Amino acid sequence: PLRGYAGFGTEGALHDAATTAQVRAALDHGGRIAGDIKMTPGEGEQQVLDGNLELELNSLAFIELLSSEVTNPGGRLSANYAIAGTLSAPRLDGTLNLDGFAAEIPAAGIKLKEGKVSLRANDAQRYVLEGSLNSGEGKLLISGEGGLAADAPMTISIKGEQFLAADIPAARVVISPD
């Protein structure tokens, strides 16, 4: 299987003082997911949130389900987020990290390697993206930031040098975006 789990469990409780929920699962290859959330009455009709979410995926084989163009994906995905604020104005603080990403794209004749991405959320209003990816003798760097609101602007910058974008019999494409 591309993604297996064991010991999956959820638990919830409704009380006058608080509503709580938990999720836990051991994933294949030593991965796991764990989350806790608690809602307590706040001022007026507000519900105050307090919780966290942790994720560790030590196998990225599931990526092959998302695209038939990507084969042999590798690397590790981890996340650690704190949940706070209120139900009407939640705050999410934390980071999602992709480390050691590698994959092949046979149609383009390339092997991606040493990929690294960090997505940091600040106050559920803003996120910052940073990453890099190697192919051939070159590297791409990505950086960006944006907001989570529907009308929030998002900026992404891609820079690089000598990144092998395609290596097929008809063409060898090396890019250096700035």
What are these regions (language model features)?
Residues 1-178:
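Interface amphipathic segments
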